[in-house]
UniProtKB/Swiss-Prot annotation:
Name of the protein: Reticulophagy regulator 2
Region Disordered, annotated ranges: 249-282, 331-389, 403-440, 459-481, 496-541
Protein source organism: Rattus norvegicus (Rat)
Segments of skewed composition (Basic residues): 250-260
Protein task: Endoplasmic reticulum (ER)-anchored autophagy regulator which exists in an inactive state under basal conditions but is activated following cellular stress. When activated, induces ER fragmentation and mediates ER delivery into lysosomes through sequestration into autophagosomes via interaction with ATG8 family proteins. Required for collagen quality control in a LIR motif-independent manner.
Length: 541
């Protein structure tokens, strides 16, 4: 166990040592790279400072040369380019020797150095502490969008150091791989020899001169980016067209292969070759249409409303949905309240009215002489009548016929009293209860009496009860609320006058305080009494 623990400890120590060495090497490489970068920056700074010290009197000349190269003033730049082109072709076409050209160049440099103090002012420069700062570039006479002398010196220094680095790498590659270096140099020289054989050297020199003159213009105005922006749509269109043509050729090639595989035997006639696809292939692209579904979709589409019709219905208070029936909204509720009952409601009211008459038709023995009804029978009849009235109120619309306001309060002379007794013999409770029935109960019968011929009403509408029967039937609270809303209240004087006209004396039992006095008998009430009399006359024989 101890030995195994020792082995594990040794393995852990070895791995830790390897990890430490790896980290040390990485840190050493990072430190070496940082030191190299710092040394390169220091070398660039020293070279830029030395160049700036030598060119500190040429700031104006360098600024003018930059303005000419970037074509800031097109006329001056055009004259300069024409002059340089003329000199180049003059020297190339002359028969002068190279030594003569070299001597002329040295003489020109000597004259410029001699005449510099007279024609070009001496511009004093600040001490070269930070030659690459913007403030010094602005004070050196250059424009803000052009390179100042310190910036130009810095770019030149960086270019020179980059060239030196590449030269050192090339020499190192030559020492390490001499055979590869020799092969590459020989291939490069052969390419230049072939190019010089087909293209004259003077033309190559002219191309180099034009590149030096036009390259600052291209970089300064970003002509390459602008040209690419304008040519990009054309290039994309060309690319798509080439892809389409390649796909078409590939498709034709595949088609020919398939036709070659499916070729008929030698005895059969060859089929006609066409550019279109076969019917089997084209049938795969055509959709399968169901006739029934298509007809149903067309019918639904034809039944839909147009946008104009939908807007008209919506403006009139109808909520319109596509392929549905227009429905009334809350805006048209006032129209429903003012409109007459519809045909289904009238039919329902007729059926309920007929059913009530049929159910309430008394037998013959009850029409002859009204026997004394017990209290229990009266309660049963009262509950049945209340249920039927509630059913009529729920099923039929509410109609109000104010015919009791048209009469003068007294019966007409031509009206005959029923044989069972005159109208005065009826108890005021029965008369008031019968005449003050809810409008929902009397509305179907009154509508039928006014619209069509007079029909015989059952005696249950106006029952002829004896005077001494204690039938002070009290209506439900809902009936009292309806009668209170439908009829106006009468004062005590009018109530006494009506009692005197009806022949009711003070010996009559007092009325309940909640029951209203009977309204005056109008023509409708007389018609009801007459119909009751005719019913009795028909039953008695």
């Amino acid at each position: 166990m101890a030995s195994s623990g020792g082995g594990n400890t040794g393995a852990g120590g070895t791995s830790g040592l390897g990890l430490g060495l790896g980290l040390g090497l990485c840190m050493g490489e990072a430190t070496g790279d940082a030191e190299e970068e710092a040394a390169a920056a220091e070398a660039v700074g020293r070279l830029a400072t030395s160049l700036w010290l030598r060119l500190r009197g040429w700031e104006a000349v360098l600024a003018a040369a930059q303005r000419l190269l970037v074509w800031e003033k097109p006329l001056h730049s055009l004259v300069t380019a024409a002059t340089l082109n003329g000199l180049f072709w003059l020297l190339s076409s002359s028969s002068l020797r190279p030594f003569f050209l070299l001597s002329i160049s040295l003489l020109t440099y000597f004259l410029l150095d001699l005449w510099h103090p007279r024609f070009l002012p001496d511009v004093s420069a600040p001490p070269p502490e930070e030659p690459h700062s913007d403030s010094e570039g602005a004070g050196s006479g250059a424009q803000p969008h052009l390179l100042s002398v310190p910036e130009l010196c810095r770019y030149l220094a960086e270019s020179w150091l980059t060239f030196q680095i590449h030269l050192q790498e090339l020499l190192q590659y030559k020492r390490q791989n001499p055979a590869q270096f020799c092969a590459r140099v020989c291939s490069g020289c052969a390419v230049l020899a072939v190019l010089g054989h087909y293209v004259p050297g003077i033309m190559i020199s002219y191309i180099v001169l034009l590149s030096i003159l036009l390259w600052p213009l291209v970089v300064y105005h970003e002509l390459i980016q602008r040209m690419y922006t304008r040519l990009e749509p054309l290039l994309m269109q060309l690319d798509y067209s080439m892809k389409a043509e390649a796909d078409a050729l590939h498709h034709k090639h595949d088609k020919r292969k398939r036709q070659g595989k499916n070729a008929p035997p030698a005895g059969d006639e060859p089929l006609a070759e066409t550019e279109s696809e076969s019917e089997a292939e084209l049938a795969g692209f055509s959709p399968v249409v169901d006739v029934k579904k298509t007809a149903l979709a067309l019918a639904i589409t034809d039944s839909e409303l147009s946008d104009e019709e939908a807007s008209i219905l919506e403006s009139g208070g109808f909520s319109v949905s596509r392929a549905t029936t227009p429905q009334l909204t809350d805006v048209s509720e006032d129209l429903d309240q003012q409109s007459l009952p519809s045909e289904p409601e009238e039919a329902l009211s007729r059926e309920l009215g007929d059913g009530e008459e049929t159910e309430l038709a008394p037998p013959e023995d009850l029409l002859s002489a009204p026997p004394a009804l017990s209290k229990q029978a009266l309660d049963t009849e009262e509950e049945g009548a209340a249920d039927k009235e509630t059913l009529l109120q729920l099923s039929s619309p509410l109609h109000f016929v104010n015919t009791h306001f048209n009469g003068a309060g007294s019966p007409q002379e031509g009206v005959k009293c029923p044989p069972g007794g005159p109208v005065e013999t009826l108890s005021p409770e029965a008369v008031s209860g019968d005449l003050m029935a809810p409008s929902s109960t009397l509305s179907p019968q009154l509508c039928l009496a006014e619209s069509g011929p007079v029909t015989l009403l059952s005696p249950s509408v106006l029952p002829s009860l004896p005077q001494d029967s204690p039938q002070a039937l009290t209506a439900p609270e809902e009936e009292e609320a309806l009668t209170t809303e439908d009829f106006e209240l009468l004062d005590q004087g009018e109530l006494e006058q009506l009692n005197a006209e009806l022949g009711l004396g003070p010996e009559m039992p007092p009325k309940p305080p909640d029951v209203l006095p009977p309204p005056p008998l109008g023509p409708d009430s007389h018609s009801l009494v007459q119909s009751d009399q005719e019913a009795h006359a028909v039953v008695e024989p």
